[in-house]
Swiss-Prot record:
This is Myotubularin. The active site is at 375 (phosphocysteine intermediate). It catalyses: a 1,2-diacyl-sn-glycero-3-phospho-(1D-myo-inositol-3-phosphate) + H2O = a 1,2-diacyl-sn-glycero-3-phospho-(1D-myo-inositol) + phosphate; a 1,2-diacyl-sn-glycero-3-phospho-(1D-myo-inositol-3,5-bisphosphate) + H2O = a 1,2-diacyl-sn-glycero-3-phospho-(1D-myo-inositol-5-phosphate) + phosphate; 1,2-dioctanoyl-sn-glycero-3-phospho-(1-D-myo-inositol-3-phosphate) + H2O = 1,2-dioctanoyl-sn-glycero-3-phospho-(1D-myo-inositol) + phosphate; 1,2-dioctanoyl-sn-glycero-3-phospho-(1D-myo-inositol-3,5-bisphosphate) + H2O = 1,2-dioctanoyl-sn-glycero-3-phospho-(1D-myo-inositol-5-phosphate) + phosphate. Gene3D superfamilies: Pleckstrin-homology domain (PH domain)/Phosphotyrosine-binding domain (PTB). Belongs to the protein-tyrosine phosphatase family. Non-receptor class myotubularin subfamily. Its main location: cytoplasm. The lineage of its organism: Eukaryota, Metazoa, Chordata, Craniata, Vertebrata. The modification Phosphothreonine is found at residue 495. Keywords: Cell membrane, Cell projection, Cytoplasm, Endosome, Hydrolase, Lipid metabolism, Membrane, Phosphoprotein, Protein phosphatase, Protein transport, Transport. Residues 1-40, 578-602 are annotated as: Disordered. A 1,2-diacyl-sn-glycero-3-phospho-(1D-myo-inositol-3-phosphate) binds at residues 288, 313-314, 376-381, 421. The GRAM domain mediates binding to PI(3,5)P2 and, with lower affinity, to other phosphoinositides. The modification Phosphoserine is found at residue 18.
């Protein structure tokens, strides 16, 4: 039977604990029959349906719909819920069959999900049952079309940690030793007037004035000027990011832009060249001249060394993921698996991203040059490359807190268009702006965790939880397209951060084998032979193919559970005999010896 939690990496246990506490406080009664309920979540309707499970066949159940999720319970067994799907995960809802349909279970709804699932429900033809469910699901899965709020804006969850406080740009730049004599913090974009998709605070060369920045902005796509992302703690080589120059077919030049890149180059006295990595294939960069874009030519930028990284655009990546979906859900064809996987080109794209990031990281680590990274607009491939390179170079970003800061900084504050790429609350499933750019980044991170199992503080469940809530609309973290829009909507005041959930339950997301090595640089092997399809994400809904947890990790978790059980028993013993434990001049040998042992790390 298909389950709501197809792998051990699922946030639902945390969610259930949250709801149990709410019930104990008297705020919300236990909804075990009609489904779980978060604070702020309200029931809308329920209907008897037949779920066409692709793995075990038809299941008769009752479908509950709230303003956050759809939830299915079997009417035939009293087992755990069969489905628990946030409405934000839904990409498309279609009616199947018509009034003349006569086949068994041929009349109902077909639901396509962003997490690679397809859900099919058969309904009775009489009584407008399908129309009612279709209308309710459409309104609440795609609330923006009906002037309804996303669930994040009505979510009333409370956590002991405020995830919005995790990232402070001044503190993060200070951690990197900035500002210094070569770099300064500029507030030229404080009102988002220079660039409406950049953060309010930017790090730029000390010798460049704010007026210089304004002139440079006119020659960069979307005004996304070159700014610093990361600086090496020893050799002070920097990773910069920006968008393409507006060269056009006429070969337009900007003396201000050329001088600005020279100033960047001169911040690192160890080299006479500035390395520019253009993420695009060279032919695409040339083609972009026709629409006013382009690249840094040798004539205009003689002190720059330009390389193209051959990473394809959002449309190619969207098609590649569609092919992955076709081969992993609902069934995997074993006989042609390798050729089918190769035909998706998904691992080839992962390889190119990792290879490009290694080139960026190695150039900076060697101190040979500072690096400028861009694609077309500087918010998709650019973010992938800078974050992966920074993960390779800086061990801080491989911690749980550091990774959260990395995502907040390079993806969220620098304007990756999450709303457009994911389509939060939008029913236009065929929108050409949708693309799995952030999913690819997380996949690359997972590949690195497989090759360096002790280098990352977080585990696979951490990455899966991030992706699940990328779509769920339960939290405000990934909503909207840029920092300016989030400030206007007061997201940090009106919504909960996903980091609140994670940082309040760190044990569930911690890698037991983590060994902190802050100065270690890691370069993954990028040959396709060493890359894998992430089974526990892409094929997690198939109960027949799910990977088993690592035996050592499983044993570690068992020991942790055993430790917690002993601590609980010790606390119960202390509560049961308070007088004896307090009055005795010599503590019982058992309790005196057990307590310290409970702090031993297994």
């Amino acid at each position: 039977m298909a389950s709501s939690s197809a792998s051990d990496c699922d946030a639902h246990p945390v969610e259930r604990e949250s709801m149990r506490k709410v019930s104990q406080d008297g705020v919300r009664q236990d909804m075990s029959k009609s489904g779980p309920r978060l604070p702020g979540e309200s029931a809308i309707t329920d209907k008897e349906v037949i779920y066409i499970c692709p793995f075990s066949g038809p299941v008769k159940g009752r479908l509950y719909i709230t303003n956050y999720r759809l939830y299915l319970r079997s009417l035939e067994t009293d087992l755990a819920p069969i489905l628990d799907v946030p409405l934000g995960v839904i990409s498309r809802i279609e009616k199947m069959g018509g009034v003349t349909s006569r086949g068994e279970n041929s009349y109902g709804l077909d639901i396509t999900c962003k997490d690679l699932r397809n859900l099919r429900f058969a309904l009775k033809q009489e009584g407008h049952s399908r129309r009612d469910i279709f209308d309710v699901l459409t309104r609440h899965a795609f609330p923006l079309a009906y002037n309804l709020p996303l669930f994040a804006f009505v979510n009333e969850e409370k956590f002991k940690v405020d995830g919005w406080a995790i990232y402070n740009p001044v503190e993060e730049y200070r951690r990197q030793g900035l500002p210094d004599r070569h770099w300064r913090i500029s507030f030229v974009n404080q009102r988002y007037e220079l660039c409406d998709t950049y953060p309010a605070l930017l790090v730029v060369p000390y010798r460049a004035s704010d007026d210089d920045l304004r002139r440079v902005a006119t020659f960069r796509s979307r005004n996304r000027i070159p700014v610093l992302s990361w600086i090496h703690p020893e050799n002070r080589a920097a990773i910069m990011r920006c968008s393409q120059p507006l060269v056009g077919v006429g070969g337009k030049r900007s003396r201000d832009d050329e001088r600005y890149l020279d100033i960047i180059r001169e911040t690192n006295k160890q080299t006479s060249k500035l390395t520019i990595y253009d993420a695009r294939p060279g032919v695409n960069a040339v083609a972009n001249k026709a629409t006013g874009g382009g690249y840094e030519g040798e004539d205009a930028y003689p002190h720059a060394e330009l390389s193209f990284l051959d990473i394809h655009n959002i449309h190619v990546m969207r098609e590649s993921l569609r092919r992955v979906r076709d081969i992993v859900y609902p069934h995997v064809e074993e006989a042609h698996w390798l050729s089918s996987l190769e035909s998706t080109h998904w691992l080839e794209h992962i390889k190119l991203l990792l290879t490009g990031a290694i080139r960026v990281a190695d150039k900076v680590a060697s101190g040979l040059s500072s690096v400028l990274v861009h694609c077309s607009d500087g918010w998709d491939r650019t973010a992938q490359l800078t974050t992966l390179a920074m993960l390779m170079l800086d061990g801080f970003y491989r911690s749980i807190e550091g990774f959260e800061i990395l995502v907040q900084k390079e993806w969220i504050s620098f304007g990756h268009k999450f709303s457009s790429r994911i389509g939060h609350g939008d029913k236009n499933h065929a929108d050409a702006d949708r693309s799995p750019i952030f999913l690819q980044f997380i996949d690359c991170v997972w590949q690195m965790t497989k090759q360096f199992p002790t280098a990352f503080e977080f585990n696979e469940c951490f990455l899966v939880a991030i992706l699940d809530h990328l779509y769920s609309c339960r939290f405000g973290t990934f909503l909207l397209n840029c920092e300016a829009a989030r400030e206007r909507q007061r997201l940090a005041e009106r919504t909960v951060s996903v980091w609140s959930l994670i940082n309040s339950n760190k044990d569930e997301f911690t890698n037991p084998f983590y060994a902190r090595e802050s100065n270690r640089v890691i370069y993954p092997v990028t040959s396709v032979r060493h890359l894998e399809l992430w089974v526990n994400y892409y094929i997690r809904w198939n109960p027949r193919i799910r990977q088993q947890p690592h035996p050592m990790e499983q044993r570690y978790n068992e020991l942790l559970a055993l430790r917690d059980d002993y601590i609980k028993k010790l606390e119960e013993l202390q509560l049961a005999t308070p007088t004896k434990l307090t009055d005795s001049s010599t503590p019982p040998s058992g309790s005196a010896q057990i307590a310290p042992r409970m702090q031993t790390h297994f």
